[in-house]
Amino acid sequence: MLRRAQCLLRLHGNGGHSLVSRFRNYATDEGNPKQNPNPNPRAQKPGTKNLPALRNPFAAAQDRTKNSYLTMVEIFQERDVHRRNHVEFIYAALKNMADFGVERDLEVYKALINVMPKGKFIPTNMFQAEFMHYPKQQQCIIDLLEQMEDCGVMPDHEMEAMLLNVFGRQGHPLRKYWRMMYWMPKFKNLSPWPLPDPVPDDTLEMAKLALERMCTVDLRSKITVFETSELKDAIDDTWIVSGMSPEQEKLLREHSRQKALYIEGPFHIWLRNRRINYFTLRADADSEFLSELDERQLDEDDVSHIEVPFFGRAPPRRHNQLGKLRSVHQQDDGTIMAICATGTSTKDSLLSWIRLLEANGNPSIGEVPVLFRFTSEVPAKAEEIEGGASVPATSDNSSQDEHISSRQK
């Protein structure tokens, strides 16, 4: 149509350029404010594209459960035969997994892998296989497997078949899967302190598991659960899990009445994704006793210098048969008398712990002064420093010490 108009204008002479421009504006709907009232200036620039806006359905969800999460994945799969934006959808789903509580669910990860089309991303020659055919899609699934590894979710053989159908045997996600299946079973049951999966929600049960793990350093240690309601003057009504061995009771009886004991903490121990606070009853190191020890004695718990008695080498000669031997509780920085975890982690509950230890076979603790030495929380101190407030210089005794006389109980 434009070519015919140009031919007519050439025959008629003047006004050709203005009329041709009018035809062009009519064909492109430009220059007409009625048909194009709000022209997009970015659309008129060469080299720019109008991309469709993507909506994140996971961020706007009201019911944040596993069923609603899987329902949104199914809606995306059934939306159209020719689906687009697979990578963006999977990344949005991975980002919002923690909000739905499905970051450790293998079924959900399988549903996300099933979003990818089957057969399209399989390389057909060695160049495509080595140079990462469809790199954006392959990296997306590799990031999904990486998140599974970070959350401790071990894949199964069904996931291998799914990756094989999507990316083929030479795909990089399948190589990542094989590496995970080689290492993760080795580390899954490597810990000598197995935990139930999932870990219990009861804080008392978690405290028992934590102290049992720490007290395995002495096989004769005994875990005892106290109730503060057994004491008349107890302020906090809570439970106390205490760990102590006969060797520690002996060290407590032999402890000098003139030297103080320290309740230090709270320290942290992690049981999977749960954190437990615990406290220690510690005494200063006995320098005279440590100086009398034979330097040639071998520490059976030291793994820094392990000698293997093979290949013609004589076994290491031990010097622990004669002389004084130190207990595993007697360290260079102090002697651990007992450890505990309480339901409230307050001074009142720790004071009740000392009274219960005295009433249950440790009467000598009532003749020894006890000091509280609480460590400050790191986040609170960091906020104080970043806020510009003046932080006083502190020494080793900077933590709050409070003298408690057991005779005044």
From Swiss-Prot:
Please name the gene that encodes this protein: ECSIT
Q: What does this protein do?
A: As part of the MCIA complex, involved in the assembly of the mitochondrial complex I. Involved in the innate immune response; promotes the production of antibacterial peptides.
- Assembly information from the UniProt record: Interacts with Traf6. Associates with mitochondrial complex I assembly intermediates during its biogenesis.
What's the source species for this entry?
Drosophila melanogaster
Q: Which GO terms describe its cellular component?
A: cytoplasm; mitochondrion; nucleus
Q: Which Pfam families is this protein grouped with? A: ECSIT_C, ECSIT_N
Q: Which UniProt keywords apply?
A: Cytoplasm, Immunity, Innate immunity, Mitochondrion, Nucleus, Transit peptide
From the UniProt entry, list the residue stretches annotated as the region Disordered: 27-53, 383-409
* Family of the protein in this entry: Belongs to the ECSIT family.
Where's the transit peptide located?
1-26
InterPro entries under this entry?
A: ECIST_C (IPR029342), ECSIT (IPR010418), ECSIT_N (IPR046448)
Q: Where in the cell is it found?
A: Cytoplasm; Nucleus; Mitochondrion
Query: Which Gene Ontology BP terms does the record give?
Result: cell surface receptor protein serine/threonine kinase signaling pathway; innate immune response; mitochondrial respiratory chain complex I assembly; regulation of oxidoreductase activity; regulation of protein complex stability
- Domain of life of the native organism: Eukaryota
Q: Where is the composition biased (Basic and acidic residues)?
A: 400-409
Q: Which SMART domains match?
A: ECSIT_Cterm
Its recorded name reads Evolutionarily conserved signaling intermediate in Toll pathway, mitochondrial
